[in-house]
Design a protein with these regions (language model features):
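N-terminal [4Fe-4S]-dependent radical SAM core
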Residues: 2-22, 32, 228-303
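Glycine-rich beta-alpha loop elements in corrinoid/cobalamin-binding modules
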Residues: 14, 40, 59-253, 260-261
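Conserved SAM/AdoMet-binding glycine-rich loop
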Residues: 27, 43, 62-63, 341-490, ...
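N-terminal pre-triad scaffold of radical SAM enzymes
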Residues: 31, 291-318, 343, 351
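Terminal amphipathic helices with adjacent charged low-complexity linkers/tails
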Residues: 64, 193-241, 255, 264-267, ...
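Flexible glycine/acidic-rich beta-alpha junction loops that bind and position SAM and/or redox cofactors
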Residues: 87-96, 144-146, 176-181, 205-209, ...
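Conserved, mostly hydrophobic/aromatic
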Residues: 168, 275, 310, 335, ...
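Intrinsically disordered, Lys/Arg-rich low-complexity segments
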Residues: 604, 609, 613-683
Length: 683
């Protein structure tokens, strides 16, 4: 296996091979060790290495005790810890709170290699191993839990992860500036308790040591008992996440106060170029080879990240609270150089899978005003419900980069697989980029995210009206025909988002039918910590208006909305018919429900009318045909995948940091998939 460089030490033997007696820092991660800039552990460890520190990587350590945290011996300065690229709870559980058996960020794609709430567990174990050493906790999982937050898996409000974990400092956002400054100050001998002024960090303190100027939001106990207070706190937090206009935020936790400093400045272009030019091997560590490798590398190994941040402002998205709404991007030379290096890799077949980021076609900040006054607050969006008149729309720079990469020797195709923001694309009066996108950069299918079609639901999502998507869709197929290509759109669609009623779901099903769209896999809204949509889900309030928002929380209601997205499946006929009857849209039954499904529902109804069903106390039931002799049949009433008592394992069962998981997934559960095929119905 050829590499650009060596992997960083993962064991004491690796340290000794380099002639090191002691590390300066240990970087702990919840993912398997993949030395690629798409992985947070790789970036932070390589960045520290570039600053001259001796760094070791502790990937997916054992979490039954703290012994694995002593693998390298005691580091000189401390630990940098992250939970992984994906929130560990999302990684472990479906939106229905069913345990997953798979984890693409673990060896062999198997689950169980990290604990629930891994960021908290790892921090506690590091503190247990070396109580006197500083622990800096960062990454997505910590960023989204820096304030008191609603926890969907326990269905309760939890305090800041700073309190639960015991971390000395929470580094929120992408973390490069914070990491370098904190490391420098620790190495200079400064006590971690005095490092309280770094932008992009949070810490706990008492009332007497609060900063002079700050805005305060309702404390943990208040937001845990008062949903209006929770919604107001959410708005304060969202309105102060801009590096120009944001203020220091204070929120009382159980005893101490959480202080969030203003966000760190985004990396400027040369800094981004430097980060992505670090000597990554771009591969998973060889120790995973015998285990089947790390599946997550497949999609990103030959992909290039060209930007960070997103001003799209979707309410359900964590990016605005983590990466921020200000877009920064790498230089064309940096991107082309990375593509050229790829062509020399032994596994490269000529295909670059993606040149993108959170939103592929964003290259610059949305407008000049935000550079002076910061991003707009109060729930205002650059693109929804309409495109802001101040927004700068320009694809020319991105187009030049794509052209240069296409011309590299050894490159056959350059695809764009990360999300294209179609409303931004449609706002560009110059359609040159759109034409070349269709002709050169679509691998048969293009992923886009209309999410829904009902106006009310789209408004709560922070998405543009469906008419914008319709115009984009028509133009995409028109340009594809002109280019002589048979290409399809793959729309991201979501059910049960706050504000989405059953009538809205029926409206979406009707839209899909009329537009010949048949989603093969569907996604239910997943309430993850820190987002505006999760605030609406928990409180039933819009945090910007405090007006009530309908939220579907019942299992039956969610199932009806979800199955309406797959109205065409005969197995969904019963639920689809029920939803249509409940919304008085029986006129749609012949259109949405296939004949096979309607017949099956009728037969099932006749059988139910002709039988006596007795449910017994032990969870079994007996079916006895009416008017017939026959031996009754006894069956288990417990749904598949549950224990005889019908109980689900609790997602909170693995919260204890010093014990093994209380259960292991036994079935091959599927993750929520955000990929659907769309077909044009033949006329």
């Amino acid at each position: 296996m050829e590499h650009y460089t060596e992997f960083l030490p993962i064991s004491r033997a690796d340290m000794e091979a380099r002639g090191w007696d002691q590390l300066d820092f240990v970087v702990v991660g919840g993912d398997a060790y993949v030395d690629h800039p798409s992985f947070g552990t790789a970036i932070i460890s390589r960045l520290l290495e570039a600053e001259g520190y001796k760094v070791g990587v502790l990937a997916q350590p054992r979490y039954t005790d703290c012994e694995d945290f002593k693998r390298f011996g005691k580091p000189k300065y401390g630990f940098f810890i992250g939970g992984g690229n994906v929130d560990s709870m999302v990684s472990h559980y479906s939106v229905a709170k069913i345990p997953r058996a798979e984890d693409e960020y673990s060896p062999g794609g198997k689950g169980g290699a990290r604990p629930d709430r891994s960021a908290t567990v790892y921090t506690r174990l590091a503190k247990q191993a070396y109580p006197d050493l500083p622990v800096i906790l960062g990454g997505l999982e910590a960023s989204l839990r820096r304030f008191a937050h609603y926890d969907y898996w326990l269905d309760t409000v939890l305090p800041s992860i700073a309190e639960d974990s015991g971390a000395d400092i929470i580094s929120f956002g992408m973390g490069e500036h914070q990491t370098v400054e904190i490391a420098r100050r620790l190495a200079a001998g400064e006590p971690v308790e005095s490092i309280t002024d770094v932008d992009g960090t949070c810490y706990l303190t008492d009332f007497d040591h609060l900063p002079e100027r700050y805005v305060e939001c309702a404390g943990f106990r208040k937001v845990a008992s008062d949903k209006v207070a929770y919604a107001k706190a959410c708005r304060i937090q969202m309105d102060n996440q801009d590096v120009v206009s944001g203020n220091i935020i204070v929120q009382k936790q159980s005893e101490k106060y959480l202080v969030q400093n203003i966000p760190a400045k985004p990396l400027v272009r040369w800094e981004l170029d430097k980060v992505y030019a670090l000597p990554y091997t771009r591969r998973y560590h060889p120790i995973y080879e015998a285990m089947g490798g790390v599946p997550a590398i497949r999609e990103v190994q030959f992909s290039i990240i060209q930007n960070r941040g997103c001003f799209g402002g979707c309410n359900f998205c964590a990016i605005q609270l983590h990466q921020g709404r200000r877009v920064t991007s790498r230089s064309a030379d940096s991107i082309v150089a990375e593509a050229e290096r790829m062509t020399h890799e032994p596994d490269f077949k000529g295909y670059i899978h993606d040149i993108g980021g959170p939103t592929a076609n964003f290259r610059f900040p949305s407008c000049r005003e935000q550079m002076l006054r910061g991003m707009c607050n109060g729930g205002k969006h650059c693109l929804a419900p309409t495109t802001c008149s101040h927004m700068i729309v320009d694809h020319s720079d991105y187009l030049k980069i794509l052209r240069r990469v296409r011309e590299l020797p050894g490159v056959k195709k350059v695809f764009i697989r990360s999300g294209i923001r179609f409303d931004y694309l449609m706002a560009d009066p110059d359609d040159t980029f759109f034409k070349e996108l269709v002709e050169y950069h679509v691998s048969g299918q293009l992923k886009v995210a209309p999410e829904h079609c009902a106006p009310n639901t789209l408004a709560y999502m922070g998405k543009p009206p469906i008419e914008t998507f319709n115009k984009f869709k028509d133009k995409f197929y028109e340009l594809s025909r002109k280019a002589g290509k048979k290409q399809y759109l793959v729309p991201y669609l979501m059910s049960s988002h706050p504000g989405s009623t059953l009538k809205d779901a029926v409206y979406l099903a009707e839209y899909l039918y009329k537009n010949h769209m048949r989603p093969e896999q569907v996604q239910d809204f997943y309430p993850t910590p820190g987002t505006v949509s999760t605030c609406m889900f928990y409180t039933g309030l819009d945090p910007y208006t405090l007006k009530p928002v309908f939220v579907e929380k019942t299992a039956e209601g969610k199932a009806l909305q979800r199955t309406l997205l797959q109205y065409y499946e005969p197995r969904n006929a019963e639920k689809v018919i029920k939803a249509l009857k409940m919304t008085h849209r029986e006129d749609l039954i012949p259109l949405l429900v296939p004949a096979e499904g309607r017949i099956a529902v009728q037969r099932s109804a006749r059988r139910a009318e002709a039988a006596d069903v007795t449910i017994h106390g032990d969870g079994t039931y007996t079916v006895r045909p009416r008017g017939k002799g026959g031996k009754p049949q006894s069956r288990s009433a417990a749904p598949a995948g549950r224990n005889p008592a019908g109980r689900q394992p609790s997602p909170g069962a693995r919260f204890a940091p010093h014990s093994a998981p209380a259960h292991k997934p036994k079935s091959n559960q599927q993750k929520e998939n955000t990929s659907w095929k769309t077909s044009k119905k033949k006329k």
